[in-house]
């Protein structure tokens, strides 16, 4: 049976496609997909556009139900989906955040250039591999007691920095300064605590990675200078989230939300969009637990940052400060946040769900660090193991077009099982090494699942985002060494 989506799409311009409100019963607004014509053909190959239409049925939704060009099918919301609901009349949906709450990306800068980094890449990767636990069920080097973990859930990255695992200025370069308000550890189950207490400081599995990169192209020298980026610079990109803790939080509250749908007589075309009014007890319990998981993820990336710095110190025999290892920025791409946005000339308080989408606030936004406020925030977009990553800058138009949101990566075009089958019998590590990318992984299966062909062309995704006015490219960086599960 074909999984092609044959619903209506109206071309607005080269970069935007509309799903009309009358496409299906229950839609309260239109769906809007950011893509070019070639990508639309790919996007129609699964049911992700149907999920865009389903999200448009959420009570209290305002603006469009949005999808970024890296859209693909997910749980409830499509991955690459953005949906904003009114705080006072709308709902919150765990399917709009996903299981890996605050899966996100952090980039650490260095003062090194490639001629210093490339000869040391094997030593660096080996040291990192032995310093940072990775893989399914991996356990961290530090075990946290329940009271200590509760502090992490409230204070996020700050709790880790206060224990000596970071610099005081680190938190200034993290979205929400690494600690989102509203956390309530009493909303978190005992099972989530058990899963989380040994997983802080771990990379995890699947598409999570740690990558050493070098800056290959600068598109905007002025903003690159403000970001502290220069040609040939060595960067480190960390991509991970809240591990088993966030997964358990989502699992626990999905069950609650299923019952809440009946309680509040909410009817939706997909039970995976289970939700509750934001201000209901169920909505608030989920939001408080989700914030705990988001703070857990920021703490996780902070611990990993400490061990990255430590690893570089060992290999180069210089201090991390001397190596210029400050944080460029840290962004979440699976999260629901309370934000104010202008809709039809009114400022509205909204719950913005971003699932596989990155905040891309433009210039002048008070939530941004002082350093970036005049130009817009860094938007960190990983590609695949073979092609590299982009660092973008949020644009003013994104505030009008997408609730200040952009893409989060390349987006899959093959399922993990399809990728695994297509790569059978190949030595992926050798293929990447021939391209100058050293890879170290616990599992060859992960490398097969994460082959470059499993992903869209990140350059094409970024072009759409830029042409649509959501974020503009500042820097392109290529990998020289990648650590996976």
Q: Where are the regions a protein language model picked out?
A:
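Domain-length cofactor-binding catalytic modules of enzymes
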Residues: 1-51, 61-64, 75-77, 87-96, ...
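Active-site beta-strand->loop segment that positions catalytic residues and contacts the acyl thioester
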Residues: 57, 73
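Redox-cofactor-proximal catalytic regions of oxidoreductases
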Residues: 82-109
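A glycine-rich phosphate/pyrophosphate-binding beta-strand-loop-alpha-helix module
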Residues: 106-126
